[in-house]
């Protein structure tokens, strides 16, 4: 492949929590463990880079600590970040996963939901570039 894999798919911080059951309305349940990891477009970009494909993120990242950590991980994976920093931070996705694998998510929007047309238009596309747009961001 002579071009880059460019993804506009939003990147958010994912907090998966494994639980025994979904709580009733107004109830609560304890999670076995909680951890955090970047999700969304991060996964696709890092997979492309791991296969030797030049990869570039075109999803906004912010100035907050979650954005800082994700930006660092993207760079370590060999992914170029094409968009300017926005003031704020990326959103968070809380995933409740019960014992049979059923998942429910609670999503907060962050700077990843604010891509400006002007910032995207400043990205120079080259022959052979492939632009990935996720339907979930539309």
Annotate each predicted stretch with a short phrase.
Residues 1-60, 68-69, 128:
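Glycine-rich phosphate/adenosyl-contacting loop at the front of the ribokinase-like
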Residues 1-11, 60, 72-85, 97-138:
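Ribokinase/PfkB-type carbohydrate-kinase core domain
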Residues 26, 41, 91-93, 110:
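Glycine-centered small-residue hotspots that permit tight backbone geometry or close packing
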Residues 35-39, 88, 110, 114:
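Conserved phosphate-coordination/catalytic loops
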